[in-house]
Regions:
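Conserved phosphate/ATP/ADP-binding segment of small-molecule kinases
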Residues: 118-210, 241
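A non-catalytic, amphipathic alpha-helix used as a structural packing/dimerization or gating element
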Residues: 60, 129, 170, 245-253
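Charged C-terminal helix
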Residues: 244-283
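Conserved N-terminal subdomain of the carbohydrate kinase-like
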Residues: 1-105, 109-117, 275-282
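Short pre-catalytic strand/loop immediately N-terminal to key active-site residues, enriched for Gly-Thr
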Residues: 12, 210-224
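Short, small-residue alpha-helix embedded
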Residues: 146, 220-243, 247
Length: 283
């Protein structure tokens, strides 16, 4: 069975990060090997939560797995607590990333033009190094702008879809050039304020060109949707599916999950009802 090492946090509530990646990758026929960056009583959208940083454990995971001669078909990183942890993870990559390993990085730093509480200039510099090593990255538009130094306000100031897609694609091309390799960049959750209908776009910039996927926009920000998207894309790519088709499946899976969740009074921090739709991922 194919194996993926997933570096992300483990939250007791919120169905995000590792609790999103494990079922999704399992449904795709891949063993998820958790590498927890932190443990939380619940994701940070809850009013009350406690957390513990597990940075000191990362070298121990690296050491034990190396001694056990583990091989990974994929490595996938999400939430990181800071630059020190990223540096530990870079050592992990140096140990386990081989010619036949697929590396996906979701450079979690912010959203909607705002940075998260973990953000710092040192985190950004470390995230740039990590992102450049990846075969595929899935930043949202805020994170993509942070990585390139572009203005989020300027990019989102375009009123028409074509100009917004063009500007976003140019940022994606900059990220590909920064990586110095044949990297696929998928910029997620792009919204055009003047669309006649509420759509959200995922824009892929690859060697083949630009691919734009649109899906219905739900005006609620549920926990874990980015983790679900990245997990589907990661698993599909490891299974040999193209980036474009991986995005299509991830978007469809998310649409059905969110639409079902909108039927009840689920709070955004409680995440989406994705479990019943895992069947869509099983082939």
């Amino acid at each position: 069975m194919k194996k993926v090492a997933v570096m992300n946090d483990l939250s007791g509530f919120g169905k995000c990060s590792l609790t999103a990646a494990i079922p999704v990758l399992s449904a795709l026929g891949i063993q998820c090997c958790p590498l927890p960056s932190a443990v939380l009583t619940g994701q940070t959208g809850y009013k009350y939560y406690h957390s513990k940083d597990l940075s000191d454990m990362i070298p121990l995971y690296t050491d034990a797995w190396r001694k056990n001669n583990v091989h990974f078909d994929g490595i996938y990183s999400g939430f990181m607590t800071g630059p020190e942890q990223i540096n530990h993870f870079l050592d992990f990559i140096d140990t386990f990333y081989k010619d036949d390993t697929f590396l996906l990085t979701d450079p979690i730093m912010g959203d909607d033009g705002e940075t998260y509480s973990i953000y710092s200039q040192n985190l950004l510099e470390s995230m740039r190094i990590l992102s450049a090593k990846a075969d595929l990255i899935t930043p949202n538009l805020t994170e993509a702008c942070l990585l390139t130094g572009d203005s989020f306000q300027q990019v989102t100031g375009y009123s028409d879809r074509d100009s917004l897609v063009k500007a976003t694609s140019e940022i994606g091309q900059k990220l590909r050039e920064q990586s110095g390799k044949n990297q696929d960049v998928v910029i997620t959750g792009v919204k055009c304020k003047n669309d006649s209908k509420p759509y959200i776009y995922n824009i892929a910039i690859t060697e083949k060109g630009i691919f734009t996927n649109k899906s219905h926009f739900f005006d609620v920000s549920f926990s874990g949707t980015g983790d679900l998207f990245a997990s589907v894309v990661c698993g599909c790519r490891i299974n040999g599916v193209s980036t474009e088709d991986s995005i299509k499946l991830a978007s469809s899976f998310l649409y059905h999950s969110i639409a079902d969740t909108m039927k009840d009074d689920t709070q955004p921090e409680d995440a989406v009802n994705f479990e019943k739709f895992l069947i869509e991922l099983i082939k």
